Amino acid sequence: MTIMRKSHPLFKIVNHAFIDLPTPPNISGLWNFGSLLGMCLILQILTGLFLAMHYTSDTLTAFSSVTHICRDVNYGWLIRYMHANGASLFFICLYIHIARGIYYGSYLYKETWNVGILLLFLTMATAFVGYVLPWGQMSFWGATVITNLLSAIPYVGQDLVEWIWGGFSVDKATLTRFFAFHFILPFIIAALAMVHLLFLHETGSNNPLGIVSDYDKIPFHPYYTVKDFLGVILLLLMFLTLVLFFPDKLGDPDNYMPANPLNTPPHIKPEWYFLFAYAILRSIPNKLGGVIALVLSILILALLPYLHTSNQRSMTFRPLSQSLFWVLISDLFLLTWIGGQPVEPPFIIIGQLASILYFLIILILMPIAGLIENKLLKW
């Protein structure tokens, strides 16, 4: 008699995905972040569901309802702070996951990579509309500034902005539809994550050496279930430390003031995880140019499979590419810092140089480094 997990139509799917899945024996802790992202998504959906039970998406009561959650609902403060800081945790895992994909050449699995880019865009959209919901000062002005960027699109721009706003400014209609988007998008993300996994299991996982490991595989369970569980424990430990001791560390103090269309905050900026893109947007003194640069800063990831010139997949044995990779990471940290600074010298020129370097490394320097390394291998 066959084991139930191998014969039952439903359990069979789970078995092939998480139990008997053949996995390379040498994948490092950096491969944990896929499962950690799954954990983050579940955490966000659950906490978000409980918040939605008490939240009201009306401009007059939204801010008060969030205050009510924190003050009057049982453990409401905990749920609210877990949800708010859970977004930061999500993006930390997301950025490490992408960085690992770039470092080890995982982008050569084109379908998996492209679905991943779509997931990134959807996650960014979800985080953006979610940030508007508390209806604080930064929520309101962030929504106004970012949605207004669409007006840079020739011919249809202004109509598009008014269509998204549901009127002639960010108001009740905008808040209601943003709440609807924020509720539905995570479920679309969950469905796409399944597609992401489906494409990954078609090819099998990559590994740190970037070589074919078909002849040497081990089952996912118990080896990697235990390893993933360790990652979950460590991440939850750090997460709960942040939530319980420093809940407002990553937030903006301006968002504790109710939205006021007549009073602009001194410095409008998004959450920390969007600052690098915001710095790239601001580095071009032209509205349309800035919007194009902003979109390209993420969309450029789709070009990576076509810009891969090296004979080796992974950067493990490629010192030139490694150096450029770490310069790119440093550049992103620099852009994140610049995004949080006011638009004044010397920050303007630093932001412009960092933005140029970002595109230069990905589009020109990394492919050249790959070609040089190919030559060095022949010597």
Swiss-Prot record:
Co-factor(s): heme b
GO molecular function, one term: ubiquinol-cytochrome-c reductase activity
Binding site for a ubiquinone: H201
Main location: mitochondrion
PROSITE patterns recorded: CYTB_CTER, CYTB_NTER
Keyword annotations of the record: Electron transport, Heme, Iron, Membrane, Metal-binding, Mitochondrion, Mitochondrion inner membrane, Respiratory chain, Transmembrane, Transmembrane helix, Transport, Ubiquinone
Residues that hold heme b b562 according to the record: H83, H182
Localization of this protein: Mitochondrion inner membrane
Family membership noted in the UniProt record: Belongs to the cytochrome b family.
Protein's name in the database: Cytochrome b
Species: Thomomys talpoides
